[in-house]
Amino acid sequence: MAQLSHIVYFTLHDPSPQKVADLVSACHRYLSHHDGVVYFSVGTLNRELARPVNDLNYDVSLHIVFDCKDSHDRYQVEPSHLRFIEEQKPAWKQVRVFDSDLTQA
């Protein structure tokens, strides 16, 4: 079964350092400990990397790799994931989600 990569880019209404830190903290608190997660990280935009191909239209990026699609599907309805959305959604100006099946070399 293929691993599934779930990447989310958040743009905030208020991109102040405190609001960005609050979202990063909430990602760790609510999203990092789910069954089937083989990789978890969350980070902030690196504004120094401003090449023409860089998309600078986000504040926080969330990266999760699941062992399979079924684990991802269970994560989507987990109470802690739903709490995260309910708590954090008012701060979001835009959310972009990129889900990909991964292949092994």
Question: What function would you assign to each model-found segment?
Answer:
Residues 69-95:
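C-terminal structural segments of small proteins and small subunits
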Residues 1-59, 63, 67-74, 101-105:
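Short S/T/G/P-rich N-terminal loop/turn motif that feeds into the first structured element of a domain
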